[in-house]
């Protein structure tokens, strides 16, 4: 319901969704909470929060470093605790999780979905789980009313795009390019054909991710037919560059978000 309300409100305002990604516990749990509070106060549409993992294969160097910083003190219990705190802090903002399959399967699929539901999470995207394996999680996602998000990639067949569109709830994570995460100077690929194809299969909003780091990228994404963007590496880079100055970090995050959504 939170995603539905968000997209309906944005549509009335003729605005794009802007969803930031950060890793929970980076650089520590207390500051991670302050970062999330700053993001919310800066007017982001929703949150995409990562669980730190030792082998984040879908991520480039910036977010890999973020995982490593968080792993120094990360635990599933602390992740859940912070998620609860975020949900208590703001009951309305959609919260999405980005996790790697191993974390979910080692915890127990149904246990994991039950736990995140209790924490107030709205959606889950499993970074390294192909669509073909969707049945391993869909039953638990539906049982616990968690929206399962799937990825639509530039090299996907029409059949795979149809599956991603039909099974994704909340939104479809559409890749601006293949490869791993990372901020780009320019959006190299035109995702308009993929987005157009997705929209023939489902009305579920398509969000563009991978490489979003400038205001003009959001304009480009809008021109491609996307309903919003997900921005990770450019934001995580600000965290990395200001590890020794918490106030400067939060101010720079605030400035960056303001610039992106103005």
UniProtKB/Swiss-Prot annotation:
Q: Which GO terms describe its molecular function?
A: tryptophan synthase activity
Answer yes or no on keyword Lyase: yes
Q: What keywords sit in the KW lines?
A: Amino-acid biosynthesis, Aromatic amino acid biosynthesis, Lyase, Tryptophan biosynthesis
Q: What class of enzyme is it?
A: lyase
Give the active-site positions: 48 (proton acceptor), 59 (proton acceptor)
Q: Which Pfam families match?
A: Trp_syntA
- EC number(s) stated in the UniProt entry for this protein: 4.2.1.20
Q: Name one GO cellular component term.
A: cytosol
Q: Which domain of life is it from?
A: Bacteria
Q: Which PROSITE patterns match?
A: TRP_SYNTHASE_ALPHA (PS00167)
Pathway where it operates: Amino-acid biosynthesis; L-tryptophan biosynthesis; L-tryptophan from chorismate: step 5/5
What the entry lists under SUPFAM superfamilies is as follows: Ribulose-phoshate binding barrel
Catalysed reaction(s) here are: (1S,2R)-1-C-(indol-3-yl)glycerol 3-phosphate + L-serine = D-glyceraldehyde 3-phosphate + L-tryptophan + H2O
This protein's assembly is summarised as: Tetramer of two alpha and two beta chains.
What is the stated purpose of this protein?
A: The alpha subunit is responsible for the aldol cleavage of indoleglycerol phosphate to indole and glyceraldehyde 3-phosphate.
Q: Which family does it belong to?
A: Belongs to the TrpA family.
Do you know which HAMAP family this protein is assigned to?
Answer: Trp_synth_alpha
> What's this protein's name?
Tryptophan synthase alpha chain
């Amino acid at each position: 319901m939170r995603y539905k309300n968000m997209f309906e409100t944005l549509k009335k305002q003729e605005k794009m969704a802007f969803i930031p990604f950060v890793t929970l516990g980076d650089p520590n749990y207390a500051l991670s909470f302050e970062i999330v509070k700053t993001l919310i106060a800066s007017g982001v549409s929703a949150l995409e929060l990562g669980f730190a993992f030792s082998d984040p294969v879908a991520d480039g160097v910036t977010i890999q470093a973020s995982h490593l910083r968080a792993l120094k003190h990360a635990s599933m219990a602390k992740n859940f605790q912070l998620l609860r705190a975020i949900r208590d802090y703001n009951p309305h903002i959609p919260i999405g999780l980005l996790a790697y399959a191993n974390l979910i399967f080692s915890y127990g699929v149904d246990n994991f979905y039950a736990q995140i539901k209790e924490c107030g999470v709205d959606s889950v995207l499993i970074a390294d789980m192909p669509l073909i394996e969707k049945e391993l999680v869909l039953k638990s996602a539906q049982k616990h009313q968690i929206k399962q998000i799937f990825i639509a990639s530039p090299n996907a067949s029409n059949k795979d795009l149809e599956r991603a569109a039909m099974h994704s709830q909340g939104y479809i994570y559409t890749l601006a390019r293949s490869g791993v995460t990372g901020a780009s100077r320019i959006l190299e690929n035109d995702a308009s054909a993929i987005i157009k194809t997705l929209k023939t299969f489902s009305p579920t909003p398509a969000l563009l991710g991978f490489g979003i780091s400038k205001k003009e990228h959001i304009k480009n994404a809008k021109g491609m037919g996307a309903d919003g963007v997900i921005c990770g590496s450019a934001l995580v880079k600000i965290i990395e560059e200001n590890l020794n100055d918490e106030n400067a970090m939060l101010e720079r995050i605030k400035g960056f978000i303001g610039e992106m959504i103005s």
